[in-house]
Swiss-Prot record:
Similarity comment: Belongs to the glycosyl hydrolase 25 family.
The keyword ATP-binding belongs to this UniProt entry's keyword annotation: no
Keywords: Antimicrobial, Bacteriolytic enzyme, Disulfide bond, Glycosidase, Hydrolase, Secreted, Signal
Subcellular localization(s) per the UniProt record: Secreted
Record-annotated Ch-type lysozyme domain positions: 81-294
This protein's name: Lysozyme M1
TM helices/strands, residue ranges: none
Length: 294
């Protein structure tokens, strides 16, 4: 999740303060912005243009949340177990060594969106997270109304979504959630959506040998795929459900592998809000998922 008004205050242009009265000339005091402050994201609820989407943007719209912090996004901080974050260019420059020191074991990083956009911070984030010793993976923000699942899987696999057995690379993620630019299900029927997702999965697996992880909410999956269970035996499931003690899993999946439990987390090395996530298992199981030995 990107930062909103709080970061706008810290990331604005330097302010000049004029002092008068006792001095003949005004004294300008420049307030420098925070070095790693993230850029200001478009407010949820408005159309999100190409390249601007991020993990959770549709979830905010689905839950009727505005631009500022909300108790449903803050929620109880579940800091137990194996912890991680997800990021995009909206988080700005990230100190990945500090993220590791803050106790984060894994990270998912936005790589692509549709078939025309590669996140401009992906390469730096992906490399620096690896060098910091964080197990990381890439995610693709789906635009099912723009092109086929096959075409988008190809674009993702060719632009950061690849996989290798190196102890630090997780399988890629298909981020498919409430359309941030229009109708919830992108104008597709449940049958069309199932086909789109299945095509994406099939092509991604053909390109990488891995089953793509699916990120979404219970509401979106039940509504837009008709509670489809066709991916349950194939894809690890990542559920977004903020501000609760336990997530609701859609009818089509028996359990969750990852849980995005907050969109307003704070982690050393990241300026402003960042999505917080939990892995459903031990550190050894996370490594097994990364290396495809689970």
């Amino acid at each position: 999740m990107p930062a909103y008004s709080s970061l706008a205050r810290r990331g604005r242009r330097p302010a000049v303060v004029l002092l008068g009265g006792l001095v003949s000339a005004s004294l300008a005091l420049t307030l420098a912005p925070t070095a790693a402050a993230a850029p200001l994201a478009p407010p949820p609820g408005k159309d999100v243009g190409p390249g601007e989407a991020y993990m959770g943007v549709g979830t905010r719209i689905e839950q009727g949340l505005g631009a500022g912090p909300d108790e449903r996004t803050i929620g109880p901080a579940d800091t137990s177990g194996v912890q991680g974050i997800d990021v995009s260019h909206w988080q700005g420059s990230i100190n990945w060594s500090s993220v590791k020191s803050a106790g984060m074991s894994f990270a998912y990083i936005k790589a692509t969106e549709g078939t025309n956009y590669k996140d401009d911070r992906f390469s730096a984030n992906y490399t620096n997270a690896y060098n910091a010793g964080i197990i990381r993976g890439a995610y693709h923000f789906a635009r099912p109304n723009a092109s086929s699942g096959t075409a988008q899987a190809d674009y993702f696999a060719s632009n950061g979504g690849g996989w290798s057995r190196d102890n630090r690379t997780l399988p890629g993620v298909l981020d498919i959630e409430h359309n941030p630019s229009g109708a919830m299900c992108y104008g597709l029927s449940t049958t069309q959506m199932r086909t789109w997702i299945n095509d994406f999965h099939a092509r991604y697996k053909a390109r990488t040998t891995r089953d793509v992880v699916i990120y979404t909410t219970a509401s979106w999956w039940n509504t837009c795929t008709g509670s489809w269970n066709g991916m349950a035996a194939k894809s690890p499931f990542w559920v977004a459900h903020w501000g609760v003690s336990a997530p609701t899993v859609p009818s089509g999946f028996p359990t969750w592998t990852f849980w995005q439990y907050s969109a307003t987390g704070r982690v050393g090395g990241v300026s402003g809000d960042v999505d917080r996530n939990k892995f459903n298992g031990s550190a050894a199981r996370l490594l097994a998922l990364a290396n495809n030995t689970a």
